[in-house]
């Protein structure tokens, strides 16, 4: 039976704005309070989805969240009608309103961790929604994320869903942004690679000094247990604390893996040789031939990697066995990074081609191509069990473009978030979207009695 890696990209929500909410994310903080263009952001994301689908890659869509999150504001003590809640928050605590309007759920690499059926004890695909405990504006996402994933992957014969881990710092979990998987082919047992920033309970592990380590070892271990992964199919690695302090807030900002290949920066991990040795040995035991592509700091400094998002790229397997690297426009605009990529593709190695996309609206908020997608490896029978409404096709692309143009504003500043009409616009748009994607009632406003 054939197997595929399906990329489910986050559809940018209608409240996309530059709130500067993500401490430790250089782009997010440096572009704080600029005016955004939600319509352009959504169109840029859809263009990437459509282009990759047209190239033969399996592509799906993950719906955005309901924002502003009025229920979250009510939990913080704001009362009255929905409009009054928004206006009170704007008057008394604007940062809380900005957080409740964040469209950060577009970065679905943080939505969940996914283990394919070939790796799990019960032979089902397992999903654990990420608690995103480190940032308030993201910590409110997981209940809706869980409902959306359950609506997309509803067949219990094939799919198992786990709630987010306890929402405390010791189990800080950022999902697939700190997880990748190596395998000979997508349908065969592979090696799942969990990268953490610190240990919650063992003080012997080093930790960053400037920016927070968002993922704990204990969270990664808990997800592996929930998914029924065997020890011979798991490798844990600690991210280098010094690169976290340079703005590498997730591992997908400093490395990317796919198939048998890990593309990583020289400074990405602690004890790199031991980590690579484990990956090589465990993948070999499953019939695979692990390949590591190391990018030396002399060629690309960590600062350049963070500014260009070289590693926040998609490494995609083509039918001929070669790989395509999908990068943001910022890589082409960085002389050192672009020179390295030209050298990489001319060497005759696994990466044969680089494809560039304009994702400026997302990039200015600190999210590149890899942030925008959640990878799910599926056998043919499992893919057939996925809700067909979320699989990208030419008609769906056209429908979603029309939907975006109908409902999204082309300019959004901080003051606009206080407009109660924005809430009405967003709910109207999302109500229509759930019909387009055949999701049912996944949003809080649709579930109110």
From Swiss-Prot:
Give the enzyme class.
Answer: hydrolase
Q: Which residues bind substrate?
A: 19-28, 110, 137-138, 214, 252, 365
Per its record, the protein catalyses: N(2)-succinyl-L-arginine + 2 H2O + 2 H(+) = N(2)-succinyl-L-ornithine + 2 NH4(+) + CO2
Domain of life, source organism: Bacteria
- What ranges does the record give for the region Disordered, renumbered to this chain? 23-42
| Pathway the protein acts in | Amino-acid degradation; L-arginine degradation via AST pathway; L-glutamate and succinate from L-arginine: step 2/5
Any idea which residues are catalytic in this one?
A: 174, 250, 371
InterPro entries for the chain? AstB_sf, SuccinylArg_d-Hdrlase_AstB
Record's Pfam families? Answer: AstB
- Which family does this protein fall into? Belongs to the succinylarginine dihydrolase family.
Entry function: Catalyzes the hydrolysis of N(2)-succinylarginine into N(2)-succinylornithine, ammonia and CO(2).
Q: Subunit arrangement? A: Homodimer.
> What protein name does the entry list?
N-succinylarginine dihydrolase
Coding gene? Answer: astB
């Amino acid at each position: 039976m054939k197997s595929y890696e399906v990329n489910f990209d986050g559809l940018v929500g209608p409240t996309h704005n530059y709130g500067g909410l993500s401490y430790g994310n250089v782009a997010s903080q440096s572009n704080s309070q600029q005016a955004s263009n939600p319509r352009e952001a959504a169109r840029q994301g859809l263009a990437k989805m459509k282009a990759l689908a047209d190239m033969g890659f399996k592509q799906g869509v993950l719906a955005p969240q309901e924002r502003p999150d009025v229920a979250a504001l009510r939990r913080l003590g704001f009362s009255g009608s929905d409009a009054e809640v928004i206006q009170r928050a704007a008057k008394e605590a604007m940062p809380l309103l900005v957080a409740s309007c964040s469209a950060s759920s577009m970065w679905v690499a943080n939505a969940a961790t996914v283990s394919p059926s070939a790796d799990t004890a019960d032979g089902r695909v397992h999903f654990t929604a990420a608690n995103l405990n480190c940032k308030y504006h993201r910590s409110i996402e997981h209940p809706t994320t869980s409902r959306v994933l359950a609506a997309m992957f509803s067949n219990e014969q094939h799919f198992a869903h786990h709630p987010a881990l306890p929402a405390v710092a010791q189990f800080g979990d950022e999902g697939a942004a700190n997880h990748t998987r190596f395998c000979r082919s997508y349908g065969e047992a592979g090696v799942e690679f969990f990268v953490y920033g610190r240990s919650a309970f063992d003080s012997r592990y080093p930790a960053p000094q400037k920016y927070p380590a968002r993922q704990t070892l204990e969270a990664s271990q808990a997800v592996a247990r929930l998914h029924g992964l065997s020890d011979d199919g798991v490798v844990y690695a600690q991210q280098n604390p010094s690169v976290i302090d340079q703005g590498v807030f997730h591992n997908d900002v400093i490395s990317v893996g796919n198939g048998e290949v890990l593309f990583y920066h020289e400074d990405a991990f602690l004890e790199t040789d031991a980590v690579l040795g484990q990956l090589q040995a465990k993948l070999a035991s499953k019939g695979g031939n692990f390949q590591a592509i190391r990018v030396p700091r002399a060629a690309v400094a960590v600062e350049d990697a963070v500014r260009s998002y070289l590693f926040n790229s998609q490494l995609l397997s083509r039918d001929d066995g070669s790989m395509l690297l999908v990068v943001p426009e910022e890589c082409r605009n960085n002389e050192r990074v672009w020179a390295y990529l030209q050298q990489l593709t001319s060497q005759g190695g696994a990466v044969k081609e680089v494809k560039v996309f304009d994702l400026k609206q997302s990039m200015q908020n600190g999210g590149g191509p890899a942030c925008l997608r959640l990878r799910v490896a599926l056998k043919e029978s499992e893919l057939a069990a996925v809700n067909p409404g979320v699989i990208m096709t030419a008609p769906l692309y056209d429908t979603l473009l029309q939907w975006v143009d109908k409902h999204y504003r082309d300019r959004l500043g901080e003051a606009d978030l206080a407009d109660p009409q924005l809430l009405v616009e967003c709910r109207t748009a999302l109500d229509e979207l759930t019909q387009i994607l055949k999701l049912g009632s996944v949003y809080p406003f649709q579930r109110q009695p």
